[in-house]
């Protein structure tokens, strides 16, 4: 029984606590899956370009993103990748030749256009920043007097002592007294003027004729003035 149990453990039976069989070759299965996907992708690309050629359409040319690499680095990379299978190597070569047509990689002309556009944007930004830094012709640097005044205005004010506060309070009281007296004098003059006007009107309204009858002319003038107002 013990030998059978050990045998099941060696075979990877999970019932006896051993490692499941489907996890023993997980790394190999992953490699096979990657190779299969690369082969399928290369076949799809090859069939697509064959179809374009058959229909007479132009085949887009894509530069490899590794075209600018040095030959030494390319040879070293080829030596390191010698362990890979022929199918994966062929698919990778197709991907490099097509420049990642299905992967969304940019071609050489598109990359140049993007680089030119980025250079133009940088030049525009530099020109704008230079224009901002240039002073306007109308603006002039402040003079020494202006700088001195600005410095004096920015200085914190010193607190007033008792004598200065008393003088300021006295000045304010004197100013308020003068304003109050001026207002009183103005009101007095207005009242006197109104009294004179009223007395004059009363005198005109009390005028009579030789026979003692009230004179109608001032009364009519008063009514007309009220209507005009």
UniProtKB/Swiss-Prot annotation:
Residues 98-109 have a biased composition (Low complexity). GO terms for cellular component: nucleolus. InterPro entries: Fyv7/TAP26. Keywords: Coiled coil, Nucleus, rRNA processing. Residues 203-214 have a biased composition (Polar residues). Its main location: nucleus. The keyword Transferase does not apply. Transmembrane segments: none annotated. Residues 19-29, 37-48 have a biased composition (Basic residues). GO terms for biological process: rRNA processing. Residues 160-208 form a coiled coil. Pfam families: rRNA_processing. It is found in: Nucleus, Nucleolus. Residues 77-97, 110-124 have a biased composition (Acidic residues). PANTHER family: THYROID TRANSCRIPTION FACTOR 1-ASSOCIATED PROTEIN 26. Involved in the processing of the 20S pre-rRNA. This is rRNA-processing protein FYV7. It comes from Yarrowia lipolytica (strain CLIB 122 / E 150). The lineage of its organism: Eukaryota, Fungi, Dikarya, Ascomycota, Saccharomycotina. The gene is FYV7.
